[in-house]
Amino acid sequence: MLLHFILYAALSSVVTSVSLQPRLQDGLALTPQMGWNTYNHYSCSPNETIVQSNAQALVDLGLSSLGYRYVTTDCGWTVADRLPDGSLTWNDTLFPQGFPAMGDFLHDLGLLFGVYQDSGILLCGSPPNETGSLYHEEQDARTFASWNVDSLKYDNCYSDAATGYPNVNYAPSTSPEPRFANMSHALLQQNRTILFQICEWGISFPANWAPALGHSWRIGNDIIPDWRTIFRIINQAAPQTDVAGPGQWPDLDMLEVGNNIFSLPEEQTHFSLWAILKSPLIIGAALKDELTAINDASLAVLKQKDVIAFNQDALGKSASLRRRWTEEGYEVWSGPLSNGRTVAAVINWHNESKDLTLDLPDVGLQHAGTVKNIWDGTTARDVLTSYTATVAGHGTMLLELQNTTAVGVYPRGVFGVSSGQTTTFQNIYAVTTSAKYIISVYFSQPASSTETITIGSNANQSMISAQVPASSTLVSAEIPLTAGSSNTITINTSIPIDAIHVTPPNGTYYPCTNFTLAGSTTLTTCGSGYCQPVGSKVGYISPSGTAKATISATTSGSKYLEIDWINNDIAFDSSWGWGSNSRNLTVTVNSEDPVRIEVPLSGRHSELFGPGLGWWDTSTLGLLTSGWKEGLNEVVVGNVGGDEGFQSYGADFVGIRVLD
């Protein structure tokens, strides 16, 4: 009975099935790794003093005791030439005591020793040239083990032999997988278990192969010192959140908290999302050196124990995108935690403070005994259906919900008020306006004899009669509800009520093949089993291109749509600028104002070698549309405003389900 509620709450969960690789089974990274890395602040210019002072700060500032233990020296540590025996060595001007001594220093502090290398012939950041590990994997793995290294971050520069080993090649002639596999296998031959962090920049959809080789993998290109980078990165995370789990973590890149780039609310958003998406939490700021010390506000963000606990939760399940309101400038991500808890994040993309509401059904819930607002430091109790709070510009309402009731379930003791034989249930949620909701009334004791009860809602002027057979504890009926969270249901009966369950209509699906195309749009047949559930898609939706259909509705009002779309426009080169991993779509009903949604990536196959190059993988998001009337309605899927974005073409369109 609750299945359909779960389906419409988990709005981003509909994706083409992919056979994913099993994780590397070695007992490491059962929760995402935490630590500190030189790169974000010091680029490729680290030295021994920098690493040691920041490592000491991890301890002195209380960060290591919270889990930040891996200390990694990124690019800039080695030299152009190997030793006569072919082994790696360090730059002894920058690291006069040497890397083994650095490892001893870190281990004496109770920290873990991380090094950086590259799967190419040179390290990223060359020139000045620093030798890479390509063709030297076994020897370098032995060297790392002899230095008592605890983790290896393994990059992807200067690696494509077929094109002359360029610094960067986002479309290499072959998948990066074999190069990372070579180092993974070499590490596994050592007598020391080493955390392997794969840094392939999201090339060739590593979620399909990296979990079998390493403990984390970069989902995309580097984080950049600008607020827009957050939207770009989480759009790339969206289609692979279900892959996260013990020993296999999608890496959203190192943290910029403390680098004086973001405002405090922006840092809270950044840290919140990385935490609940189960990314490794690797500090990229200068904690303490001769010139710099992290500010207190940023340090407090990094030390927020609840947020760290979300990241390190034993269940190991990532949050996923649930709803996105593009024009209104906010969205909801949510996921499960251990002990039946739920974490939810409501992101305010606008740079001004506003009151935002989380409708609990959007995250699969109807009631929460407690709602803890992490960044506000407040707790609300007995929250029914909706929770509202003020969210700073670019900030996030981060919530922990406990003692919850599943969506669509309304216990009388929580939602009902009784007077005599009349019980009124309040705060009833309706995702769409429809006369086809099913109410199931559960009684706390069997009916002693056949009884006729009446049921009404504020969306219906007359009461509905339903007959309860003798000895029955359940009766169901069809009732109307209006989209929103303020519906009421009134029931008259002498039988004591335990709870009601409310189920929305299944709706009707309209495939893209039923739409009339205009302008630039084209209909394409996909490979067998792809572009689900239709097998075809409409593409090349320019700002003047449309797909139009006439759709019948049984009632007027606002209707909830589930739109199936495809987007694999990955921001590689464009990630340094305004690339966002998103594309635009609009839905217009009866010439009303279009409802716009900027959809994230959906691709779950390699953009270079996979079926359809990732452009056959469907995902789903929901949106509420207005302007519906009883009878026939003109529905237009288009790309209104697309010419104002970075990418003028919209996402590909597969179909829509209208909940009427």
From Swiss-Prot:
This protein's GO CC annotations: extracellular region
Enzyme Commission number(s) of this protein: 3.2.1.22
Major location (coarse): secreted
Catalytic-site annotation from UniProt: D155, D222
Subcellular location: Secreted
A GO MF label: alpha-galactosidase activity
InterPro entries noted in UniProt: Aldolase_TIM (IPR013785), Glyco_hydro_27 (IPR002241), Glyco_hydro_b (IPR013780), Glycoside_hydrolase_SF (IPR017853), Melibiase_C (IPR041233)
Disulfide bond positions: C124-C157
CDD domains: CBM35_galactosidase-like (cd04081), GH27 (cd14792)
Residues that coordinate or bind substrate: E200, W201, G202, I203, S204
Pfam families on file: Melibiase_2, Melibiase_C
Glycosylation sites recorded in the entry for this protein: N47, N91, N129, N182, N191, N351, N403, N460, N492, N506, N514, N584
Keywords for this protein: Carbohydrate metabolism, Disulfide bond, Glycoprotein, Glycosidase, Hydrolase, Polysaccharide degradation, Secreted, Signal
Calcium keyword on record: no
Gene Ontology BP annotations: polysaccharide catabolic process
Signal peptide location: 1-20
Catalysis performed (reactions): Hydrolysis of terminal, non-reducing alpha-D-galactose residues in alpha-D-galactosides, including galactose oligosaccharides, galactomannans and galactolipids
Known function: Hydrolyzes a variety of simple alpha-D-galactoside as well as more complex molecules such as oligosaccharides and polysaccharides.
Family: Belongs to the glycosyl hydrolase 27 family.
Protein name per the record: Probable alpha-galactosidase D
Organism of this sequence: Aspergillus niger (strain ATCC MYA-4892 / CBS 513.88 / FGSC A1513)
Gene it is expressed from: aglD
